[in-house]
Amino acid sequence: MTDPSPSLPGLRPFLPDDAGALAELCLASIEELAAEDYSEAQQEAWAESIVADGFGERLARSLTLVATVEGAPVGFIALRDNRHVDLFFVHPRAAGQGVGAMLYDAVERLARARGGVLLTVDVSDNARGFFERRGFTALRRNTVTVGDEWLGNTTMEKPLAAPDAGGGSP
């Protein structure tokens, strides 16, 4: 994969052929971006649980958007049931370059346009600040068992303003 920084990312819907590249992107993101918050064993269990059998089908069942640079995926977000941000990953080389913000803003606009009134997410420790900056509030802390490991995450929510009420990202 080339360095994604020289070009602005494009945005497109998930295609079934994306599953392999997005699985690799997940693994790289977990390994490099979550190292400060999760042990190596926790990262491995987390990664294995995400890219298990059915990963492509899971993405296809959701509204999944893919950010690309020069045709290569650099991030993706999956919105389930027009309400829950199910999966959201950015490649480490694209982190901090606005890819995550672009993906999130697009999915929030789509959810609102489709009548969504609330977004929820179970957010990893390293992504909590990203969601707080976008108006999400923490509801509860969770401990999730994955294989022989436990992972901590936080359930967060954000009410969406109606499209005709001047809604938008704060």
Segment roles from a protein language model:
Residues 1-20, 162-170:
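Conserved N-terminal entry element of GNAT/NAT acetyltransferase domains
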Residues 7-10, 83-86, 152:
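Short amphipathic alpha-helical segments
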Residues 62, 135-136:
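Short glycine-aromatic motifs
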Residues 98:
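Glycine-rich phosphate-binding loop
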